[in-house]
């Protein structure tokens, strides 16, 4: 309400129209005031809130008092204040302080303050565009460059001020301002409490394994660091004080170490934490986690292929083997495509694979069959065929194992008329990475139902399909024993000759 007081007075003393004006000019104020004798410039200077502090420092001090008094009183005060030795008051600091609220005896200025105040005033007059902060930095640098003889006048003036201060305030004892001291105490208390709280909190969150404590932990640590480092000024956003935060960061790092043992997940914010300090604990944890995860994908354990025997969708790791129908008794001829053959060793054939019966059948014989377009009827259920075609196909597979394209053609010409999507090509090609592309189109997998099994020779079988495999996991190529539990035949066949080495490379990504 201080700013409104003069206007309220003016409404009493002046014409009503002026009261509506939010910022009447100074000349109007002097005209309407009981003491119009004051010059316009004086009144302007003594009403800084409407002039945006033109002269600033002296007037700010009496700003709240001025508003309560008529212009003549204010002019007299301003003239007295102009004669006052302002070197005794470090005005830049005073502007920010709460001097208006309570009388506060300031400490006597030290030599640097004497220098900075005088130099700041001179420079501010010469270069009004200079930002105050830049000015302060420059003054500090210059002060460090001064030699003793250059500093002597300022040191002497500071000593004189100190003696004068002692005279003026004999019982003066320096006490930090209560507001700031409270802030300091709070910062220390917060630092203590938060450092004690961080570990239980962080461990609790780590145990939950869902909410990484890093962000909250770091913010908790930032705030004490920033409070303690910046107790002189208003708190700033936690990200700004780089140096002040260091102690906090160190605390987090120190407490980051127990976390891996306390919780099974080490959720550390690696942007702020030195990884070198955490490497042993964190990496050991990661190792165990990864090993467990990958072991479950590895075919040598035997789980990828066998679970399919029950016809349920088994999800081993990232891919599911869904063999939805039990293969007929002929499943002895059930084959997984060669791409699954690569890991023969993990699954020793549970019964001797039938020997291909028509090895001599030329691959050219198949093209007589009309080529089934890859997206042809989703031939998951294939017409029942004698095991001979399956075996002949096996024969072709054997002969064609190294030429993927012919093999896929054979499949497409195969008597079953199964729509073999071109995805078979990547599987039969020695390089596995292409499989990733093919694997992702799951609909095509289903279209080529026997895509993964030569069991297509057995009729009306929904062929187990791997859903969405990642070549990084070896099991992608593991033979699936179709629902009859018969081992995939190709294990004994040559495909392992070219696929096995690649398989071994892929087992451990």
Curated annotation (Swiss-Prot):
Signal peptide: none annotated. Acetylated; acetylation impairs nuclear localization and ability to transactivate expression of target genes. Deacetylated by SIRT1. Phosphorylation at Ser-64 and Ser-211 by PKA increases transcriptional activity and may help delay chondrocyte maturation downstream of PTHLH/PTHrP signaling. Phosphorylation at either Ser-64 or Ser-211 is required for sumoylation, but phosphorylation is not dependent on sumoylation. Phosphorylated on tyrosine residues; tyrosine dephosphorylation by PTPN11/SHP2 blocks SOX9 phosphorylation by PKA and subsequent SUMOylation. Transmembrane segments: none annotated. Residues 394-509 are annotated as: Transactivation domain (TAC). Keywords: Acetylation, Activator, Differentiation, DNA-binding, Isopeptide bond, Nucleus, Phosphoprotein, Transcription, Transcription regulation, Ubl conjugation. Residues 1-66, 160-271, 335-415, 420-439, 479-509 are annotated as: Disordered. Residues 63-103 are annotated as: Dimerization (DIM). Residues 341-359 have a biased composition (Pro residues). A motif (9aaTAD 2) lies at residues 290-298. It is found in: Nucleus. GO terms for molecular function: chromatin binding; cis-regulatory region sequence-specific DNA binding; DNA binding; DNA-binding transcription activator activity, RNA polymerase II-specific; DNA-binding transcription factor activity; DNA-binding transcription factor activity, RNA polymerase II-specific; RNA polymerase II cis-regulatory region sequence-specific DNA binding; sequence-specific DNA binding. SUPFAM superfamilies: HMG-box. A motif (9aaTAD 3) lies at residues 460-468. Homodimer; homodimerization is required for activity. Interacts (via C-terminus) with ZNF219; forming a complex that binds to the COL2A1 promoter and activates COL2A1 expression. Interacts with DDRGK1. Interacts with EP300/p300. Interacts with beta-catenin (CTNNB1); inhibiting CTNNB1 activity by competing with the binding sites of TCF/LEF within CTNNB1. This is Transcription factor SOX-9. It comes from Sus scrofa.
